[in-house]
């Protein structure tokens, strides 16, 4: 049984930031990454990397088959919306993310999570997001900082050191490419209007 499956039965994290970062890195290594439809339009990534929404969506179908038939998404009983592909594939990850956020930013409520692997997103605004987001990064790499344009200055943050909280719907932000062999993961906790009921209740 891997750590993702264990989350349903017992706590995963220790309460020590760096130990828990190593645990989260191990968990993320067990996940198969790809790019969701919206992220494919933002940036090309090699197979095995990508950016995926873990949460709910109003889109009831995942894709169309060559025959024209729809592949339907699983319905989320908590919201009445539909689970994203990664949510259906890794349901136990929800408990892990809730435990982690309750440890390190318990005052922040969220209803969606973006999971990223080697995805140096270009400058953008998260126009659909509501309010602030919390970003945390993991991995052994050089550069790969999160850049935020604020007050006519560029801030560079290494989100491996502590959670980074900012309003991505109002502040232009992007990720520096890494310049060494290694893997950069990041998790972004946020809210959007499609989540309706909070996933962390």
Where are the language model's segments positioned?
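Fe(II)/2-oxoglutarate oxygenase catalytic core
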Residues: 1-163, 169-201
């Amino acid at each position: 049984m891997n750590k993702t499956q264990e989350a349903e039965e017992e706590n995963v994290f220790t309460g020590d930031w760096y130990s828990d970062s190593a645990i989260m890195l191990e968990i993320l290594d067990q996940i198969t990454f790809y790019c969701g439809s919206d992220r494919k339009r933002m940036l090309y990534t090699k197979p095995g990397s990508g950016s995926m929404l873990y949460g709910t969506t109003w889109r009831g179908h995942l894709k169309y088959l060559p025959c024209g038939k729809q592949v339907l998404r699983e319905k989320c009983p908590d919201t009445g919306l539909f689970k994203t592909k990664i949510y259906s594939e890794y349901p136990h990850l929800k408990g892990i993310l809730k435990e982690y956020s309750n440890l390190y930013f318990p005052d922040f409520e969220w209803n969606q999570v973006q999971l990223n692997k080697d995805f140096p997103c270009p400058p953008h605004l998260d126009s659909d997001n509501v309010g602030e987001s919390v970003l945390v990064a993991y991995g052994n790499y050089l550069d790969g900082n999160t850049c935020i344009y604020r007050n006519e200055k560029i801030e560079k943050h290494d989100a491996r050191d502590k959670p980074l909280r900012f309003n991505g719907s109002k502040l232009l932000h992007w990720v520096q490419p890494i310049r060494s062999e290694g893997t950069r993961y990041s998790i972004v906790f946020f809210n959007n209007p499609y989540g309706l009921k909070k996933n962390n209740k």
